[in-house]
Every structure is written in structure tokens, then in C-alpha cells.
Amino acid sequence: MASQIDQYAVFGNPINHSKSPFIHTLFARQTQQSMIYTAQCVPVDGFTEAAKHFFAQGGRGCNVTVPFKEEAYRFADRLTERARLAGAVNTLKKLDDGEILGDNTDGEGLVQDLLAQQVLLKGATILLIGAGGAARGVLKPLLDQQPASITVTNRTFAKAEQLAELVAAYGEVKAQAFEQLKQSYDVIINSTSASLDGELPAIDPVIFSSRSVCYDMMYGKGYTVFNQWARQHGCAQAIDGLGMLVGQAAESFMLWRGLRPGTKQILRELRKNLEGAL
């Protein structure tokens, strides 16, 4: 790339609605970093070629979103521990020796958002709904917060069992089928994308209590259907995934630039945009 300005991007398909360029442009302005961040829509079979070209042309780093996170994992020359455990990469960085480092900042983004919302994770009982890539990416960061217990539940019980076994070296995680859930939890995290389709998991609402904090990784205008359901059953607090989006972006920015940007103002701006106030 001819420009002297450092180049960053997000790769995905579709990518039109990505908020990453908005977020990282504000991060750069806030921290007085000279950089350009663009959105790149890549053919579903063209990620590796596009990423190679981007870095060959001087690109410094990129984010990776659906459906390329697993391919980015294979593309990276080196992996952080959290990326290796997640089995997926959402952040790539070109190192001084020319190799590409793969990282996964999703779990840290979730934890930082929960802590920013004054959610107590240490000593908490946590229920994680879903056993896909999103769940896999957040388990170790959650275990690092020393909860009393983490239970993974999934429509297909075998997947929950596999995920619990995968992280066993980092801490005990229980696996339960939906129909086995017969108690309430302090923190309930929905890692599935069901809310985007207006669907709810087939789980007994006994999981909710007046002390429960409920977190849906999806977000939209107003409450997600999962958070509406949680509120109807008396949960103390219902949070969507917009703060996780900003948190994982801040962690990526830190990896690239060595500076941790503030997130509160940017989260407020995004929320205004989402609610149609701007």
C-alpha cells in the first residue's frame, strides 16, 4: 500500500452492517493514532487469498468475522493460548518478523463488559447456553474470573460434553442437557444466535431468579427476545452483546497499537445509532 498510514480492516461476508470501522476510527481518534480501518467483503472461498494480499500490501492487522474465524485460525503462523483454545481467530497481527499472529478477543470482550456492568463473576454460578464457537471462545476467560461453577448446556448434549472436556485442564465445567436444568443461576449467558431469528432455547425458566444477571451475545434495537424472556421471569438485569462487541474491538486495538482505548463513549454512540436517536 502506497500510503504511509497504517492499514487495518475487517474481513467478513456479509460485511455491510459491520460496526468495526466506526468503532476503530473512533478508537484511533481518541488515542491519536494514525491509521485507516476499512471493511472488506470477501468471497466465501477467498479469505486466505484476500488476507495474504492484504498483508503483502503492507496491512498491519485485521479483524475476522463470520464465516472466516476458523479459516483465520488455520491461516495464522502463530496462535495465542486463548485463540488455540477457542479454535477460532477474530484478530490477526503482522509481527516484526513477518509472521502472522492469530488471537481471539471475544472472551475478553465479554468479561470486560460484564465487569463494567458491575456483574460479580468471582464465586458466581454461571450457566452458558450453547456449545458452538462463541461459547468455546469465552469459557477460559470466564474460568479465569474464578466463578463457583460453570455449567454448559446445549440442545445437543454431546456437544456440551465435548466442550466441557476440552477446557477441563483450565477448570471444571459441567455439561447438562436442556431438560436437566432444574435450578437458578447467578449469571446466564446466551451464546447462541437464536435471538436473531426470534427464537428461544427450550429451557425451563426456573433458571431465572430475582438475583440472575442475563446476558445475550446478540444485540439489536431494544431488548433481544432472550432478554425479554429473562425479564418476564424476574431476572435482576438483562444485558445485550453490544458492549462485548466494543470490548473485543478494544482488545484487538490494544494488540495492534499497544494502547487500550476507552469504551464508554463509543458504546453510548453505538447505542444511540442502534436506537435510531441519531
From Swiss-Prot:
Shikimate binds at residues 18-20, 65, 90, 106, 223, 248. Transmembrane segments: none annotated. Its EC number is 1.1.1.25. CDD domains: NAD_bind_Shikimate_DH. The keyword NADP applies. GO terms for cellular component: cytosol. Disulfide bonds: none annotated. GO terms for molecular function: NADP binding; shikimate 3-dehydrogenase (NADP+) activity. Gene3D superfamilies: Leucine Dehydrogenase, chain A, domain 1, NAD(P)-binding Rossmann-like Domain. The keyword Membrane does not apply. NCBIfam families: aroE (TIGR00507), PRK00258.1-2 (NF001310). Belongs to the shikimate dehydrogenase family. This is Shikimate dehydrogenase (NADP(+)). The lineage of its organism: Bacteria, Pseudomonadati, Pseudomonadota, Gammaproteobacteria, Vibrionales.
